[in-house]
Amino acid sequence: MSFSGRWIGEFQTHSIPWRPGIHKRESRTGRSGHEHFPGLILPEIGARNTVGRAYGFHYGWSGGHQMIAEELPDGRRQIQFGHACDSHNGPAQSFETAKLYAVFSDRGLNGCATAFQRHLRDHILTFPKASLPRPVHYNCWEAIYFDHDLGSLKDIATRAKDLGAERFVLDDGWFGRRDADSSSLGDW
């Protein structure tokens, strides 16, 4: 299972069966995102959200990257992740790739998600005062999309504050006449 997407259609799942040869996904845009997510889930036959065995991989890099899934002629399978092909140094220079995070779950696909989230919270995004509640932000994008009416925004911000939000994020559409995803973003 791999993932791709675009604006308002993020994280579309693509199930591609193993077959002899190479399946390659690559992003040379210089960034990762929902259109080129640097990750993969390999569920065993019969695995679903809460049952079965699954392996998850996430390449910890936000730049150009590639993923290769290969079934060898003898039936063995291998996975490779790394920087995009043009990411190399000159002679006599070293190059170190990003980390590849890998998990195994015998509790289905959700078990992979839980393991990734636990590792992220315990080892990557640690908070100095873990016993205190974490800051809450409210992003209004999905509540209003392109309809930036000041009265509605104030009402939503007040309700977010009442729920404990410490920051109100006005996401998208604050410049010009932004009424579609094809204009005005940053036209200020």
Which residues are covered by each model-predicted region?
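Aromatic-lined carbohydrate-binding/catalytic grooves of carbohydrate-active enzymes
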Residues: 131-188
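Long, charged amphipathic helices and adjacent flexible linkers at domain junctions
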Residues: 120-130
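Residue-level detector of functional hotspots within protein domains
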Residues: 26, 122-124, 154, 174
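A general structural-boundary detector
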Residues: 79, 125, 140-143
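N-terminal accessory beta-strand-rich subdomains and adjacent acidic, glycine-rich linkers
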Residues: 1-120
